[in-house]
Amino acid sequence: MGSQELQRKLGFWAVLAIAVGTTVGSGIFVSVGEVAKAAGTPWLTVLAFVIGGLIVIPQMCVYAELSTAYPENGADYVYLKNAGSRPLAFLSGWASFWANDAPSLSIMALAIVSNLGFLTPIDPLLGKFIAAGLIIAFMLLHLRSVEGGAAFQTLITIAKIIPFTIVIGLGIFWFKAENFAAPATTAIGATGSFMALLAGISATSWSYTGMASICYMTGEIKNPGKTMPRALIGSCLLVLVLYTLLALVISGLMPFDKLANSETPISDALTWIPALGSTAGIFVAITAMIVILGSLSSCVMYQPRLEYAMAKDNLFFKCFGHVHPKYNTPDVSIILQGALGIFFIFVSDLTSLLGYFTLVMCFKNTLTFGSIIWCRKRDDYKPLWRTPAFGLMTPLAIASSLILVASTFVWAPIPGLICAVIVIATGLPAYAFWAKRSRQLNALS
């Protein structure tokens, strides 16, 4: 067993690239249409993206403080543990491993193949093997080198931003101001009310998730006291600007009623640009593959750090805490999570069912934001960076997180509650087993 610790090798730009690369995913290809449908008017659509990004800043401030107080790998697991609840911390990690981390790898890999199928026909079984090959390729990349993986992540993040920049640049030339004078597509949107805006903001929520992924790797980040706040808040602002400009341009390119009813808003909007025309679908498919490749790479890189942290605390399978003696990476954790992701590729029905665990994952995030209140009561709590206007920012972080909890509950209330029961029913016995084992190991040491 490798007993060495992971080293701090990641600088600011690599960390920023991971945060932005994880956040800018496939969701943006449909979310503009969903936000337009919810908000009901072009201006409310754009404003929803602005406010949707701004309300994420308090969340990033909370993560920044917690990550500088506990500059180690593990993110939510570490913060909940230090807030005084090891069982809750374990349950958060337990749910993440089985219902979120590995399934997300399979979902993204299959999404890449799906977009590839737009360019050339692919046999379904062959497509699954291609998806598995993508996971294996990224496993090898991130297993062999943290620096190499970070360099790739930086390049792929730049590559995924370029197509959106092209869309924004071209869209400005064919922007039609009259599209912003279009009548509202919903009764609530016609009133320009706060409820219409709130509906739009809620629809943007998923587009802004992912920045906190870097907290899983805080133990490998150089100078976390400065790097984490800059990367977390900086990534939020960068994504906010990108999404707002994209929403503005798309709303100005095509009639708003068509945008609000579009399931492929970016692709449909690009058909209104003469320079692209019929090639819009191909452009979007290639862009989507690049975007999702970056997100898949990022997840293969950061997600195994959670199980690594739990294993180091003797609260998970011991092998997950192994560090490769040459490459200084959590090799076993990367391999086993990737292997489980490949398994889910070939059991697609199970993967779709695991989507119902989203309610549990959203509630876990809310608990994490609340954990800072308990952490601040500890005598040994000494963060290197503190949340400004703590009394305002923390409630905002919790409230904005609850928006996702509420919308997810409305989407699938009964399945979501059943999944919560499953997490508790399986997680607590597992915690009892590992907690007992941990006490025994501590007694022997």
UniProtKB/Swiss-Prot annotation:
Cell inner membrane as UniProt keyword: yes
GO CC annotations on file: plasma membrane
Pfam families assigned to the protein according to its UniProt record, in alphabetical order: AA_permease_2
TM annotation in the entry: 10-32, 39-61, 97-119, 126-143, 153-175, 188-210, 230-252, 272-294, 341-363, 384-406, 411-433
UniProt keyword terms in alphabetical order: Amino-acid transport, Cell inner membrane, Cell membrane, Membrane, Transmembrane, Transmembrane helix, Transport
Known function: Is likely involved in the transport of fructoselysine and psicoselysine to the cytoplasm, where they are degraded.
Name listed for the protein in its UniProt record: Probable fructoselysine/psicoselysine transporter FrlA
